[in-house]
From Swiss-Prot:
Protein name: Protein NETWORKED 2A
Notes on the domains: The NAB domain, also called NAB (NET actin-binding) domain, is sufficient for F-actin binding.
Region Disordered, residue ranges: 105-131, 618-675, 743-763, 911-947
GO CC annotation: plasma membrane
Subcellular locations according to the entry: Cell membrane
């Protein structure tokens, strides 16, 4: 349903039918076609006098003509599709008009063909838009077209037949009629019962048909009202677009949310109306229930008078398994609720709304059938009461005839049983409708509450924007709070990002190292300043006063709201982009901090191990000495030779020794104090930093950093070479303009009687010729340099692929969990993969730019060579040039000649091109050519560049 509404809202059909003048699409196409035809005729009328013109016409003008033919064919196909669409619509409209107004239609005289077949022999389809005819019009049927052989009247045919022929015809008609009757095999009484049953069924279906017809007419009127409103609004839109020259359209997310909200509100209104009608039907059913109870009591009274009381068969009415139905409905609702609790996407939301619309439509049909069933129950109950009243009136006459009385009581009992079954069916249908109403209302509420949580399928940024879309309603407060909600969400996102970053730092830090705490806090304050600035900027922004901005008109309000909402979305995207940049900088800073923290942790852990080992040695030497003298001598020996042992330059370690058997020995030791504390300073350990073994992660990081450095240098050289293309193009354009001026002057001088005009023009054209030759040399050097850049780019891509394969291999060995230094964690591997993918994408972009630059330079070189060849023909210097270049061509096997001076030192473009070239010295060639420097800087083995 939503897809159908969207296709109707954004169709070219509006542009071609609503406007009074021709559509802009058709005007644009016609104007474009006229311009192309004029240009193509101009191309065709040109004459190819010279070989160069013929080559230009074949290689450049011929593809243009081919493109024009293709575009003309596409335009013709588009017009043909529109014509096909219009012709089908017109044919169906003609059929509808012929059906509604046959007196205005001229019937063609056809041959003896079947009236139900078209001209091609296929059966004629009924008119499509018969339901579009307004109600209240008595539509006559289309009269049959008379055959050629049946133009004679009936009286003329009867007059030519005799009485024998008439009798024969009558008897044959009766025989055919009797043979056509199908035998059912029922008796007369059974046939009467079957006829009565079928007639009642027909009556019930006709009643239901009337209800469906009334609901259809109401829906039909509402449909055309909406169609007229849409047409008027579209006319206004088109007029405004024509007036202001605008072509703006609604954003897809806004249109999607508006359509979904409108569909849900329509479903909610329809359900409310159906529930009101259902309440009326329930009240009528309760009234009929009381009447059925009264009829049952009257029937029991009659039966007890004439017969003995038997087991009450009427109470054994067949009932449906209500418990099973309740269980099925509850399970279906639970499954729908579980599905709705999942994250909704746009496609799922559209599917759920379509299901809801189909459910509401089926509820309308079921409610109409329930109302018709209640009316049928009322008529059946009326008939039952009439039969009971008749039986009560005739009971005096039927007392004598017991058989007839018993038959009538049996018939009345069957009728009462049927009425009770019908009432039970009404009750079951009512319960089913109530359950369906509950499920539909819950579904509407769930979908209305989850429109804000809908996520896009492909675009993550679109998901965040779509979550902010409110449910469209008539209240202005929800619209007024739209911008404040978006700004609060932006602030929350900034704060959440900052808190998550603080949490990551807190997990990486250890409470044993105070210096690392200070370092991380300093870094967090440094990296969090930009996010805080963003928050303060958002806080400083003042929200506009929407009450003053909104005018009185509803359309103007919608426009203002749409503009403000668009600005809010734009600000949101800008803030999100800034947050992404801040996060990227923070990640880079955190990576460096993580490396430093890891080094500090390793150093501290190593020193802790050494301290513990030295403590154990001290404890064992103090406790395990067998004799005091040996212990004292040993202690004195150790103190004499190793007075201090230090692990780090600032670490002091004190040991308190208070055993009772060492007090005297300590007193006898010279140079000792009487204190029981002995401060030992360890200084035997080497203070030089340990050589750190690089891990696989460090190796990969080093390779990636090396590639990044090479990328910087490569980008510098690549940008320089790309900028040279513009310089070459400008120079060639200037030279071409000067040549055109010289040609104009030469034509003017040829018209004058002077004879020295050719020599003057030739002397002025020779510097331009030499300059063009130098540019051709420079272009050849640029092409060779670009080949070197291309090879280097392929080698860089191959190195990136090798690094990526190494990361994948190490990650596959570890299984995503880092166990040792020879493995990489899954998170770090993902970061490396992301960096490599970014570099690959940069390489692809560079490759594309390089290919486009090569094409431009080749085209420029071809143009320069064409100008040079023409100048050589005009100046008559081709022979000298060929004589001078013959040995070089034979030695270089057809390759273009590059002067040695230009190859070694490069060519410097001249500023004043019209002046004669001065004698060059060797000092002007000191600066080396950038092309040669780029050519010899890198030589990598080429890899395979991706397509």
């Amino acid at each position: 349903m939503l897809q159908r509404a969207a296709s109707n809202a954004y169709s070219w059909w509006w542009a071609s039918h609503i406007r009074t003048k021709q559509s802009k699409w058709l005007e644009h196409n016609l104007q474009d076609m006229e311009e192309k035809v004029e240009y193509t005729l101009k191309i065709i009328d040109e004459d190819g006098d010279t070989f160069a013109k013929r080559a230009e016409m074949y290689y450049r003008k011929r593809p243009e003509i081919v493109n024009f033919v293709e575009e003309a064919f596409r335009s013709y196909r588009a017009l043909a599709e529109r014509y096909d669409h219009l012709s089908r619509e017109l044919q169906s409209a003609n059929r509808t008009i012929a059906t509604a107004f046959p007196e205005h239609v001229q019937f063609p005289l056809e041959d003896d063909s079947d009236e139900n077949e078209d001209y091609d022999g296929r059966p004629r389809k009924p008119p499509k838009h018969l339901h579009l005819i307004p109600k209240g019009i008595n539509i006559p049927e289309v009269p049959d077209i008379p055959k050629k052989k049946d133009f004679r009247s009936q009286s003329m045919m009867l007059s030519r037949k005799g009485p024998a022929d008439l009798k024969r015809n009558v008897s044959s008609a009766q025989a055919k009629r009797e043979a056509a009757i199908v035998r059912s095999g029922l008796s007369k009484e059974e046939g009467l019962e079957e006829i009565d049953k079928l007639q009642k069924g027909i009556l019930a279906l006709q009643t239901e048909k009337e209800f469906v017809r009334s609901s259809y007419e109401e829906s039909y009127e509402r449909y055309w009202d909406l169609e007229n409103e849409v047409t008027e609004m579209q006319k206004s839109v088109c007029n405004l677009q024509d007036e202001f020259g605008l072509g703006a359209s609604i954003d897809d997310s806004d249109a999607r949310t508006l359509m979904a909200s409108t569909a849900l509100s329509s479903c909610r209104d329809t359900l409310a109306k159906l529930e009101e009608k259902q309440k009326i039907s329930i009240e009528e059913a309760e009234i009929e229930k009381g009447r059925i109870t009264t009829a049952k009591e009257r029937f029991y009274a009659l039966r007890n008078k004439f017969e003995k009381p038997e087991s009450d068969v009427l109470d054994e009415v067949i009932r449906t398994d209500e418990e099973e139905e309740d269980v099925v409905q509850e399970s279906s609702y639970e499954s729908e609720r579980e599905d709705s609790n999942e994250n909704l996407t746009v496609v799922k939301l559209a599917e759920k709304i379509d299901d809801l619309v189909h459910r509401v439509v089926s509820l309308e049909t079921n409610a109409s059938s329930h109302t018709a069933l209640v009316k049928t129950l009322r008529s059946e109950t009326d008939e039952l009461h009439e039969h009971i009243r008749g039986l009560e009136e005739d009971k005096a006459a039927l007392v004598s005839d017991a058989t007839v009385m018993k038959q009538r009581i049996t018939v009345l009992e069957d009728e009462l049983r049927n009425v009770r079954k019908l009432f039970q069916k009404v009750e079951d249908q009512n319960k089913n409708l109530q359950n369906q109403f509950k499920v539909a209302n819950r579904t509407v509420d769930d979908l209305s509450g989850k429109i804000q949580d809908v996520k896009m399928d492909e675009d993550v940024e679109g998901a965040g924007i779509f979550q902010e879309l409110p449910v469209v309603s008539g209240s202005e407060d929800s619209r007024d709070d739209l911008k404040s909600v978006s700004t609060e969400k932006t602030k929350k996102d900034v704060i959440a990002v900052k808190e998550s970053e603080d949490g990551e730092r807190a997990q990486e830090e250890k409470p044993e190292i105070k210096d690392s705490f200070a370092l991380s806090e300093t870094a967090s304050t440094c990296f969090g300043t930009e996010a805080e600035d963003l928050v303060t900027e958002d806080e400083d922004e003042e929200t506009p006063n929407w009450r003053h901005l909104l005018p009185d008109g509803m359309e103007d309000r919608e426009k203002v709201l749409l503009d403000e909402y668009t600005s809010v979305l734009r600000d949101y995207r800008e803030v999100k982009r800034k947050l992404g940049d801040v996060e990227k900088k923070n990640r880079e800073g955190f990576f460096e901090l993580a490396l430093q923290l890891r080094e500090l942790k390793n150093a501290v852990a190593y020193k802790d191990v050494e301290i513990q080992s030295l403590r154990q040695k001290l404890d064992t030497t103090g406790k395990d000495s067998p004799h005091q003298g040996e212990g004292n001598n040993q202690l004195e020996h150790e103190q004499g030779h190793h007075e201090t042992v230090s692990i780090s330059p600032t670490s002091n370690f004190s040991v308190a020794t208070t055993p009772h058997h060492q007090v005297g020995d300590v007193k006898r030791t010279p140079g000792r104090t009487k204190s029981t504390e002995v401060r030992v300073k360890f200084a035997d350990v080497d203070d030089s930093p340990r050589t750190k073994i690089p891990t696989v992660e460090d190796k990969v990081r080093a390779d990636i950093d090396a590639v990044l450095e090479e990328n910087l240098e490569f980008w510098l050289r690549f940008s320089t070479s790309v900028h040279q293309i513009q310089k070459y193009q400008t120079t060639v354009q200037d030279l071409k303009s000067e040549l055109s001026k010289l040609r104009i002057e030469s034509k003017q001088q040829q018209e004058s009687p002077r004879s020295s005009s050719n020599t003057a023009v030739a002397s002025e054209a020779k510097p331009i010729y030499r300059h063009l030759r130098e540019i051709r040399t420079e272009l050849q050097l640029w092409l060779e340099n670009s080949a070197v850049l291309k090879d280097e780019l392929q080698g860089r891509y191959a190195s990136l692929a090798n690094i990526q394969e190494e990361i994948a291999r190490v990650t596959a060995q570890s299984g995503g969990n880092k166990v040792s230094d020879s493995e990489i964690s899954g998170y770090q591997a993902a970061k490396f993969h992301g960096e490599i993918l970014n570099m690959k994408q940069e390489n692809k972009r560079v490759s594309t730019e390089l290919h486009s630059g090569l094409d431009r330079v080749r085209a420029l070189k071809t143009e320069v060579e064409r100008i040079l060849s023409k100048l050589e023909e005009d100046l008559g210097i081709s022979s000298a040039t060929e004589a001078r270049t013959t040995p070089s061509k034979s030695s270089s096997s057809g390759r273009p000649r590059i002067p040695l001076r230009s190859f070694l030192f490069g060519v410097k473009l001249k500023k004043n091109r019209q002046q004669k070239q001065s004698a060059s010295s060797l000092f002007s060639c000191v600066s080396p050519s950038p092309g040669l420097h780029k050519q010899s800087s890198y030589s990598r083995p080429p890899g395979k560049l991706p397509e």
